[in-house]
Structure formats: structure tokens, C-alpha cells
Amino acid sequence: MPRKGPAPKRPLHADPVYSSPLVTQLVNKVLVDGKRSLAERIVYAALEGCRDKTGTDPVVTLKRALDNVKPTLEVRSRRVGGATYQVPIEVRAGRSTTLALRWLVTYSRQRREKTMVERLMNELLDASNGLGASVKKREDTHKMAESNKAFAHYRW
């Protein structure tokens, strides 16, 4: 651990189109090999597709999708006396948003649609409706935490 304390969090600037820091975070998650303009094109096209399909503000759709994907509990490994236990722990707000965005992008990359724009758009729409692989991942994470509730007293 550094002696000067934890590194300060850099401020996240809102994106120029939707004025939302969430969209900036999504662009950063889609970003590969530093190709920011390509990532922005993908995200903006996916959000426009969401607007066309639902007729609502795409940032609202993104927030609804994130609310359906954000985990409240996760398990962390804790070694006690030679045995490793999966200890359920509450997830901080920032981490839950980061995990939700990571899962959305990861599972949209695994989808079968032809372009990344279609994959991301359909994963966002599915997640906002409570469907999709990213929502299933959250449910699996909660199920894992629920089944290991007996080890909650090992929390740190």
C-alpha cells in the first residue's frame, strides 16, 4: 500500500453527445487498443438504435439496464485455517456500476449478431427488460452469495 494513501480518483467527464458520465464509462469499457473514435461510434450507434426501437431516451434505457444488472452482493475468497471460503460481501456503488458495465460489454461481445452495434444494442434492450446474459450473471452472483451466507461472519 502506498504511504501517501490511495491514489485520488480522476474526475470522469460527461460525453459530448448525451452529457452523461455513464455513457463515457460505457465508451471506456468498449474501447479496445486505444481506438476511442471507433468505440464512441459503436456506443452512439447502439444508443441511437435503442432510441429507434423503444422511442425513449437512450440514457434512460442505459440506466434501466444498469439497474437490472448491478449486483448488490458478491463473493470474495477468504483463507481461514487452510480452507478457502467464499465470503459474501456487499458491493460498493461504484464497483457495482463498473461490474454492470463490464458484464454488459462482455456478454454483448459473446452474442451472435453480426456487428458490435447490434450486439450492444440488443444486450442493452434485453437488460433493460430484465433479460439477457448480463442479468443472468447478476442472478448467478446473488445466488452464489446466498448459498454461502453461512460464511458471512468471516467478512472483513
UniProtKB/Swiss-Prot annotation:
Gene Ontology BP annotations: translation
Q: Which PROSITE patterns does the entry link to?
A: RIBOSOMAL_S7 (PS00052)
Q: Which Pfam families match?
A: Ribosomal_S7
Q: Name one GO cellular component term.
A: small ribosomal subunit
One GO molecular-function entry: tRNA binding
Give the record's keywords alphabetically: Ribonucleoprotein, Ribosomal protein, RNA-binding, rRNA-binding, tRNA-binding
Subunit note: Part of the 30S ribosomal subunit. Contacts proteins S9 and S11.
Family from the record: Belongs to the universal ribosomal protein uS7 family.
Function, please? One of the primary rRNA binding proteins, it binds directly to 16S rRNA where it nucleates assembly of the head domain of the 30S subunit. Is located at the subunit interface close to the decoding center, probably blocks exit of the E-site tRNA.
List the protein's name.
Small ribosomal subunit protein uS7
Name the gene behind this protein.
rpsG
